[in-house]
From Swiss-Prot:
This is Putative transmembrane protein 244. Its main location: membrane. One of its GO terms (cellular component) is membrane. The chain crosses the membrane at residues 17-37, 65-85, 93-113.
């Protein structure tokens, strides 16, 4: 029995990828907003999804909001990507993560070298 592989046209792949990116950042900002309400944070930077310089401490409320929103975003997006892409969910999830790292580096003008940020992304990938 031969292995059959279907290859989607590039336009379809790019449309699905763009939809996944929009979905990712929408879920990210919604989870940030909910985190701010839950943890009673009255102000949070608009660039919060890209912030890897926040002091990693359980006493730091902003760090808790960022960490929880990151984990919730990846978990929820893992569920939302399934009906959007139907297959190859891991490919899209990893591609969105690579784009997120690139955007983060561009926004913060520095490549994220902090271990807690990478650990959060690594744990998030396991949730997908």
């Amino acid at each position: 029995m031969a292995l059959q592989v279907r290859v989607a046209p590039s336009k379809v792949v790019l449309q699905k990828f763009l939809l996944c990116v929009i979905l990712f950042y929408t879920v990210y900002y919604v989870s940030l907003s909910m985190g701010c309400v839950m943890f009673e944070v009255h102000e949070l930077n608009v660039l919060a999804p890209f912030d890897f310089k926040t002091n990693p401490s359980w006493l730091n409320i902003n760090y808790k909001v960022l960490l929880v929103s990151t984990e919730v975003t990846y978990f929820v997006c893992g569920l939302f990507f399934v009906p959007v892409v139907e297959e190859w969910v891991w490919d899209y999830a990893i591609s969105v993560t690579i784009l997120h790292v690139a955007i983060t580096s561009t926004v913060m003008l520095e490549f994220p070298l902090t271990s807690h940020w990478w650990a959060a992304l690594g744990i998030s990938k396991l949730l997908v």
